[in-house]
Amino acid sequence: MRKIVNQAEKNFTVVKYDIKNEEMIEYLTRMATLSNNLTNTVIYHQRQWYFYTQNVYYTEHPNEHFKPYQYNAELIDELKECMYEYNQRKAEQNKKQTDFIAFGLDAHFLHEYYKKTGQPDYTNDELSAQVAQQVTRKVSQTFKAFRKALTDYFKNPEKYEACPQLPRYNKKRRSL
């Protein structure tokens, strides 16, 4: 998803560290692996919800070129049940309820959902809660940016070289 816009060049300084302590290498590799696994878990949930909402949209707005997406119906039912409870709690607190169909899954909802379901990648004892929340927040921001870019693409396709692509899973890394 690239915009054709002139941007100022950005300069980066790259610092390479040669870590000789085997315990530190193992620790950093383990943290990177856990973080990567959580990232892929959040991406999976976000993608499944996106597929579901696209099917709902095109059921209401038929299009001859649309091919329905496959999605995990059990996961969607579980998410919808948790969303209902989430919005009920917000209503009790006199807060605005979240429209998940229009806005997708936000990081705060996913945080509550993962804690409630005991998602192993999120509640892992080795990965701190702060890191887990940050990973969830970053992936949610990526999907929010994707939806915004996709909407803008359909309004102004000339600004883009190609249609924005759905965020993909991270590859598993073997070592640092």
Per-region residue spans from a language model:
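Nucleic-acid substrate recognition interfaces
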Residues: 1-176
